[in-house]
Amino acid sequence: MIPNDDDDANSMKNYPLNDDDANSMKNYPLNDDDANSMENYPLRSIPTELSHTCSLIPPSLPNPSEAAADMSFNSELNQIMARPCDMLPANGGAVGHNPFLEPGFNCPETTDWIPSPLPHIYFPSGSPNLIMEDGVIDEIHKQSDLPLWYDDLITTDEDPLMSSILGDLLLDTNFNSASKVQQPSMQSQIQQPQAVLQQPSSCVELRPLDRTVSSNSNNNSNSNNAAAAAKGRMRWTPELHEVFVDAVNQLGGSNEATPKGVLKHMKVEGLTIFHVKSHLQKYRTAKYIPVPSEGSPEARLTPLEQITSDDTKRGIDITETLRIQMEHQKKLHEQLESLRTMQLRIEEQGKALLMMIEKQNMGFGGPEQGEKTSAKTPENGSEESESPRPKRPRNEE
């Protein structure tokens, strides 16, 4: 049975090499199919676990034929390991299978590290990537190998997503495996394509930046000049104000006129839009009603005069209202006085009526009392008559 299948590789993980396995491997040398399959699935580099597996190989073989077969196997294995690493096979198939790097691989670790070189693994002197120094294997990549391998990886891969993922994995593995001395060179090599790609964009972006900077400087200078011009005060003469009023009237009044349109209609040198804007604002706040053009210009008033006239008119209106209010108050007082006099007259008339009524009552009550008294007097007389008079003695003389 030829050990070129994945099942055999998995079985080799659980069963380390011994004398019988070495003899069996001696009787089954590698053929062309196995060599092609191993070329398609080469190892990336010698892992650290491989150094521990080397202790499993017996230090000596009983027969010279077995030693020669073992040396040939080791030489082929070293040639395969010395080749550059490809993450994908040449036919664009699946990723190569490495049984030594799987998580289920149990490798016995030796407690003591022997600095002496390994006796039965031959490392050729012409290997570009492996150097034996004090029993420690350091992986050193030449600067010329990385760009070629990186270009081959990009050209052979068809999927852009896969290429980006493999590129990230490549950067991580190279960063962890390389020494501190080679880190700057590797980073410069990796960043070299990016710098080449970024050069055209930077050249293209220089002109818009320059234009924007120049436009910003022009805008700043224009704004400074406009601010300086706006800060400069201007005296509005009556003639200039007349031109301003004519322009406003032509544009349809102060509510519809704009500073830009007024400036175009006025056509006065040295006059800026800021002056027109401020004057138009004052003109609107003053609520100036322009006199028709038929009137003489002498009858027209300035905004300040119009404001004073408006104030006087408002004062006159206020005084007029106060005067009217005082008149109403006077009328009210007069009405109140008339009401009081009427009340007094009514009271007097009432008293007079009462007096008259009493007099009438007194007039009607006098004859009745006389009758009563007369009635009383005859009764007294009758009584007196009825009463016996004392008899006087008669004189017989």
From Swiss-Prot:
It is found in: Nucleus. A motif (LHEQLE) lies at residues 332-337. Residues 228-288 form the HTH myb-type domain. The keyword Glycosyltransferase does not apply. Residues 319-339 are annotated as: Coiled coil. Disruption phenotype: Separated male germ unit (MGU) with all nuclei separated from each other making a wide triangular figure. The modification Phosphoserine is found at S387. Keywords: Coiled coil, DNA-binding, Nucleus, Phosphoprotein, Transcription, Transcription regulation. It comes from the Eukaryota. Residues 386-397 have a biased composition (Basic and acidic residues). Its main location: nucleus. Belongs to the MYB-CC family. Transcription factor involved in male gametophyte development. This is Myb family transcription factor PHL4. It comes from Arabidopsis thaliana (Mouse-ear cress). The gene is PHL4.
